[in-house]
């Protein structure tokens, strides 16, 4: 008997968006341990769900957890930016009613110290796909100072990124996430509720897993293929991701795609892909935050492609 590891973030809000689907296919781009997947399947008995994940341990767990759904669920291993393109070759795009992506590291990955995501881990790894070639050890101990500066500035938005990069290069090698975060504590912003090394670890993790590139690629595919009558829901956990989603949804909603400097519209003014269903991002309710403090940073934005 498997123990269900956790309740998925924003579970009520996600279910509200993906209920009463009469038929068709829903794609869960970030299956994890099957929380959102099972909720959506239970709420919509006539749909099929394609679940994607790159973490083999999550796939092993969810394969067993989702067995009762039989052929209603198909699990695919890999990065969603790649797998969704394969799905569109196998299935009719007109059958796809929903796309869900819960971006970022899962609670289960954070809690497994051997994965190297935690500040207290004795490893430097941070790979969501443990077969991927790039890991945190390479970023920290082999990247040049210039490369580290790019990572810390672009993905951590750290003001003293040059100072931190210089310190890392001068004091490496580092062998664990704990050693790294402890050594850099004096250079990290303090006085906030978050751990001083949060932005540092975020920056390294994003680099290792190409998280922003994956998100951009997913949104590119959705935009290029012009899904019809499909609901797209993205959960993000920090401002970099949320900014990408917000800006892209605004682009999709726009009817006119002429350059801002254009004197008059020459694009037919009929290019809108649909409507934004969330004027502001949906956030977790207080009872969920109390039960799962990590849900505090979760933001859900939803776009509905036109019919």
Curated annotation (Swiss-Prot):
Enzyme Commission number: 2.1.1.199
Any GO MF annotation of the entry: rRNA (cytosine-N4-)-methyltransferase activity
Catalytic activity: cytidine(1402) in 16S rRNA + S-adenosyl-L-methionine = N(4)-methylcytidine(1402) in 16S rRNA + S-adenosyl-L-homocysteine + H(+)
BP GO annotations: rRNA base methylation
Enzyme class: transferase
GO cellular component terms listed in the entry, alphabetical order: cytoplasm
Swiss-Prot/TrEMBL keywords: Cytoplasm, Methyltransferase, rRNA processing, S-adenosyl-L-methionine, Transferase
Subcellular location: Cytoplasm
Binding, S-adenosyl-L-methionine: 34-36, 53, 88, 102, 109
Top-rank taxon, per record: Bacteria
Signal peptide positions (record): none
InterPro entries, A to Z: RsmH, SAM-dep_MeTrfase_MraW_recog, SAM-dependent_MTases_sf
Pfam families: Methyltransf_5
NCBIfam families, alphabetized: 16S rRNA (cytosine(1402)-N(4))-methyltransferase RsmH
Family classification: Belongs to the methyltransferase superfamily. RsmH family.
Protein role: Specifically methylates the N4 position of cytidine in position 1402 (C1402) of 16S rRNA.
Protein name: Ribosomal RNA small subunit methyltransferase H
Record organism: Sulfurimonas denitrificans (strain ATCC 33889 / DSM 1251) (Thiomicrospira denitrificans (strain ATCC 33889 / DSM 1251))
């Amino acid at each position: 008997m498997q123990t269900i590891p956790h309740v998925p973030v924003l579970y009520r809000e996600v279910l509200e968006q993906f209920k009463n689907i009469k038929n068709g296919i829903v794609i869960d781009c970030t299956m994890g341990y099957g929380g959102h997947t099972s909720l959506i399947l239970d709420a919509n008995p006539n749909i099929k769900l394609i679940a994607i994940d790159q973490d083999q341990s999550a796939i092993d767990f969810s394969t067993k957890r989702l067995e009762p759904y039989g052929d209603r669920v198909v699990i695919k291993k890999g990065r969603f930016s790649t797998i969704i393109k394969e799905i569109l070759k196998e299935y009719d795009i007109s059958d796809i009613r929903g796309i869900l992506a819960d971006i970022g590291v899962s609670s289960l990955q954070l809690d497994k110290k051997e994965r190297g995501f935690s500040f207290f881990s004795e490893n430097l790894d941070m790979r969501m796909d443990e077969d991927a070639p790039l890991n945190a050890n390479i970023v920290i101990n082999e990247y040049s100072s210039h490369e580290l500066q790019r990572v810390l500035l672009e993905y951590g938005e750290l003001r003293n990124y040059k100072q931190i990069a210089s310190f890392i290069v001068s004091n490496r090698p580092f062998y664990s996430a704990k050693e790294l975060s402890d050594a850099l504590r004096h250079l990290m912003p303090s006085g906030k509720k978050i751990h001083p090394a949060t932005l540092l670890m975020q920056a390294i993790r994003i680099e290792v897993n190409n998280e922003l590139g994956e998100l951009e690629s997913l949104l590119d595919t959705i935009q290029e293929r012009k899904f019809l009558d499909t609901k797209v829901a993205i959960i993000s956990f920090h401002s970099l991701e949320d900014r990408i989603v917000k800006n892209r949804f605004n682009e999709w909603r726009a009817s006119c795609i002429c350059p801002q400097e254009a004197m008059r519209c020459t694009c037919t003014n009929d290019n809108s892909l649909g409507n934004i269903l969330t004027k502001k991002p949906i956030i977790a309710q207080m009872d969920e935050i109390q039960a799962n403090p990590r849900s505090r940073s979760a933001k859900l934005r939803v776009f509905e492609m036109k019919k």
